[in-house]
Amino acid sequence: NEDYIPFFVRPPKEGSKAKIALIIPTNSYMAYANDNLSVNSVVAQLLTGRVPLLQPSDLLLNDYRGYGLGTYTVYRDGWGVNISSRLRPILNMRPKYIHILSPSLWQLNADLHFVDWLHEMNFDVDIHTDEDIQKEGVELLKKYKVVMTGHHPEYITEEAWHAFHDYQMQGGRFMYNAANGYYWICALHPDNHNILEVRKGDNGTRAWTINPGEYCNAFDGKHGGLWRVRGRDMCKLLGVSFTSFGLTYSSYYKRSPDSELSECAWMFEGIGLDEPIGDFGLIGDGAAGLELDRYDLEKGTPHRAFVLAHSEGHNDMFVTVSEDSTFHARGNILNGTGETNPNTRADILYYKTPNDGAVISFSSMTWLGSLSHNKYDNNVSRLMKNVITGFMKDGPLP
C-alpha cells in the first residue's frame, strides 16, 4: 500500500560546484511508459524464458486503460503507438517496480542503483534530464568535466545528438554506462517537450513496424527509425553498437590485452589481470546482460579505440539484433545465439577525443546493477571509481 512519485531536482543555474552531470534518460522513460508488456505482449515468455511476474500496477493498467499506452504497444487495430507523454501517471517508472523485460529492474529503478552508488562514494553530482539537454544543448554540458548516462538511454533527439557530439569534441569526458543507447530517433513536440514521437520502420529490433510511406515524423518532418538510417550509428557517439539481447541471466567480463597499456592501466588499479569483472549483480546476477554493445570498425568505432574487456559465457537466450542479420542461412553463426555467435558480447571501450576529452563505454544494461555488491567493495565499483576520479582531473589523460 505504497507508491512513489519520482521527480528530478536540477542544480541552481549559477553556483553549482559539481564537476559531474548525470543525464536522466526521460525520453526513454516516456517511450516505455505504461507499456504493460507482461499482459499485452504475445512473446513476453519467449523473450524472457520465464513466466511473467505481474505487478499490481500491471493489473491496474489492464483494468483502467485511461492511463494511456507506451510506444511498445499497439492500438486495437494493430497500429503501433508512436506518441507518448509524461503528463499522466506512469506506473511502471516507480522505485521497486519489476519490469517484465528484466530479471529484476529496468529504466528508472535501475538508474537508482547508480544514484545510490554515487552518493555512497561521495561524488558531487548534478542531475539533468533529456529535456534539459534539448533546451540548453552543449552549453549546459560544457559546465561539467564529466557527463554520464544511466543504464538505458535508448531514445535521443537530433538536438541532443549534436549536443553530446559537440561536448566530446570540445574536451568533455563522457561515460556511457549502458547498452542499446542512442539507438532510436525520437522527436519532442516543438511547443511541448513533454510529448515524444517515435516511428519504427526500415529496420531495427522493434515492437511494431510503421506503415510504408509513414516513416517521417509529424513533429519535425524528418525520417524516423534507427539513427543508423541517417548515417549516425551509435558507434559515432559511443564507439560501440547494439549487437545482442537476452532478457535472462547476465554474465561477466574478462580483461583484454589493451587494458595493460600505459594509456589504460590506471583504470584497473586494484583489479587482477585474470580476475572476472562483474560475476555478480542485482540484475541477472552479472554485470554483462540484458542488452549488449560491441566494438565494430565498420559501423564507426574509432580506429584509435582501446578494447579494455569483453564479456563471455552468454547463454542461448541471447539473440542477434535484426539489423545485423543481412542473410539467413543454416549454420551462419553470425545469425546465431549466445553460445555460438562471437558477436554476442559486451566490449568495454575507451578512446580519447580532441582537446583532452575521452569516451568510455561499458556496453551492458546490467553494469550499474553490480556496483553495490559486497557493500560496494568489488571490481565493478573499483573500475568505475578509478575512471571517474581520473576523468575529473585537469590536464591530459595518460
Indicate where each model-derived feature is located.
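Beta-sheet entry/capping signal
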Residues: 6, 19-21, 117, 124-126, ...
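Ligand-binding face of N-terminal immunoglobulin V-set domains in extracellular IgSF glycoproteins
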Residues: 1-9
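Glycine-rich, aromatic-lined ligand/substrate-binding cores of catalytic
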Residues: 191-386, 390-391
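Short loop/turn segments at secondary-structure transitions that flank enzyme active sites
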Residues: 13, 26-29, 124, 153, ...
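Short secondary-structure boundary/capping segments
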Residues: 36-40, 163-165, 184, 188-200
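Helical hinge/lid and interdomain linker segments adjacent to catalytic or ligand-binding clefts
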Residues: 103-190, 369-371
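Aromatic-Pro/Gly-enriched surface loop or interdomain linker
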Residues: 8-140, 396
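Extracellular/periplasmic catalytic domains that process cell-envelope and extracellular macromolecules
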Residues: 12-17, 118-119, 139-142, 168-170, ...
